[in-house]
Regions:
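Short, flexible, basic/aromatic active-site loop/helix in glycosyltransferases
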Residues: 1-7, 11
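A short, conserved alpha-helix in the catalytic core of glycosyltransferases
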Residues: 11-25, 30-63
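General structural signal for secondary-structure boundaries
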Residues: 1-2, 24, 75
């Protein structure tokens, strides 16, 4: 079925018809994970270009994908680093697509939603959610020097 409008899917399990991709370019390597860096979002950027070009993205709701997660990725330090780099990636994509102010406003809105959600959760879960949002914001609002 078509992927819901207004959302961009993740790229963990995707397939394309090569002929249908002409004119959209490939994945932007500056947004990919290279040399241990956790910058990401090349698939989000690519999906965004497809949607802007009028393409429909399809998905299989019942598909199952298994992840093997090494212990090093289950630490608080990794979680903070990953969350920070999610913010950096969001900023890079917002700069590419010239929507940085809109992305900043959206992040502030997400803070409001996060605080409301935290009021409904056990304190331990709330702390993890707040850590994630804080690190994403730090990455998003920090200008990266090239």
């Amino acid at each position: 079925r078509p992927f819901p409008a207004g959302r961009v899917p993740g790229g963990g399990n995707m397939a394309f018809r090569r002929a249908g991709l002409a004119g959209y370019g490939g994945f932007d390597p500056t947004l990919g994970r290279v040399n241990g860096e956790l910058i990401g979002g090349e698939e989000n950027d690519f999906f965004e270009r497809l949607l802007l070009g009028g393409e429909t993205i399809w998905y299989v709701p019942g598909a199952v994908m298994w992840h093997i997660i090494p212990p090093a990725k289950l630490t608080g330090a990794y979680f903070r680093r990953l969350s920070y780099n999610v913010g950096v990636s969001q900023r890079l994509r917002a700069e590419i697509h010239r929507r940085l102010p809109k992305t900043f406003v959206l992040e502030i809105t997400k803070w409001a939603a996060t605080l409301v959600l935290c009021c409904t959760m056990p304190p331990r879960k709330s702390r993890w959610l707040l850590r994630m949002r804080l690190e994403i914001s730090r990455g998003l609002f920090t200008k990266i020097k090239n």
